[in-house]
Amino acid sequence: MKNILFVIFISVVSLSAHDHIEVGVDSEDPERLALSGPDFQLALYVPRGEPFSSYLPQFPGGWHACELTFTTETNALEPAGGAEPRIEIVSVTGPVGGDFAFWEVGAVEPTWSLPTGWPGLFGGFSVALNGDTHAHGRAFTMDKPGIYTVTFRAVDDLDQFKPSVNKTVTFNALQPPNLSVSLDGGNVKLSFTSRANLNYDLQVCTDLRSGVWTNIEMHSFINGAGDIKNMTDAVAGRPRVFYRLVEYR
């Protein structure tokens, strides 16, 4: 019987709709800008070469990524008519040695990056892009897993409004679930503990030099419910097999 080499690669990718943070007028002070939106974001790891979002087809992967959009299209807030809002970064905390980065539309590398522990104001980015008040194709990335706490504020480049109150968003650069594997005769047995509200594909590759990963059809679109998922894959005729788990929303 031939020896069979099987190796696990665990990777994560998100293809979901994204959240928004509104930039508008503060309801308690009509002369001040305000930020309204989620305080928590999940940043899943996107392997190199894997798709992340239809809005970022050029994204190369290799980072924990989150597609959070700042917009002047308001619902919870009143619009800040006549303003040209820009988002400043007030502070960044997170894993030691980690970087928090912003990707502008069309970027193939970070537009700017700040190390964790950043203590002061940074210019950030304009909310409107070429007149588009709802700019798609931007992303935030983190290069190490862990919890990042980023504080933002909105300022008006035309000085018609005072800067907003600071808003802190927690980004969880989530490690993928561990994939356990064992050999049972001519089959590889794999299992992992899924996460609720996330989905999974098990992919296989027989030659890493090719860079070609293929979904195992019977183990695709697995719905996570916080339970243990058990899978098998026949390895007959394949002396070398590599597996990776793709997690997405």
Task: Specify the residue positions occupied by each region the protein language model found.
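Short, composition-biased motifs enriched in small/polar/acidic residues
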Residues: 176-249
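Short tyrosine-centred short linear motifs in exposed loops/low-complexity segments
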Residues: 136, 144-148, 152, 198, ...
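Sec-dependent N-terminal signal peptides
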Residues: 3-15
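Short, hydrophobic beta-strand segments
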Residues: 138-143, 233-235
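Contiguous segments within soluble domain cores/interaction surfaces
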Residues: 18-137, 153, 158-176
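Generic detection of short hydrophobic beta-strand segments and adjacent strand-loop junctions
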Residues: 127, 148, 167-173, 221, ...
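Short, charge- and proline-biased low-complexity linear segments
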Residues: 149-160, 221-228
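Hydrophobic residues positioned within well-ordered beta-strands of beta-sheet architectures
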Residues: 138, 150, 167-169, 190, ...
